[in-house]
């Protein structure tokens, strides 16, 4: 299985490199950052921290591999001041802010990119990310509420993983899912990632984490029965 997971990881990194979107870089970094926090193993904590620092340093402080177009493209995510498209986004957000100052509860649900429906008023600048779309549609009030709700979700799920879920197999699966969610939300600052079907996957992860304490005793019992059967079989042999 380790070989299988290694192959999948390599394919995912390659796919991220050729995807053409620099926001994809935020997904593994956000995931690793949360894994460092929820990991209860010093070995995993140390390995994840070193991996995070090594990868960040490679892209942010070196020019190694700039001859490769994919590495060069990924590295530009760490140097936004040199990215022309990012500078256009910054200018658009400044213009949006001037309009949003007069709309504390936004333009309305679906009106960040709903000009085709002919509403009375619509944001003239296209939102370049999911969080910007939330801000445009619900205003600063809605954005703060959105961030608060998801901050509580991440904190609650992390607490459950660290202190309530004892089964190692279940904790590993749910930690991987929650860390993926963290990566998605970091990427949501730069890209419209919460589109169908991504939102279904993300909120299924939250739901499973919250249900984890109820699933945990069932899996613990199953693992204990399997272990007992293995021991009995070993004695018979």
Give residue spans per PLM region:
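Hydrophobic transmembrane alpha-helices and their immediate junctions
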Residues: 33, 140-185, 211
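Juxtamembrane transmembrane-helix termini
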Residues: 18, 25, 41, 152-166, ...
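Short, aromatic-rich membrane-interface segments at the entry and exit
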Residues: 4, 23-25, 43-49, 195-200
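A membrane-periplasm/extracellular boundary helix in multi-pass inner-membrane enzymes
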Residues: 10-19, 36-80, 97-101
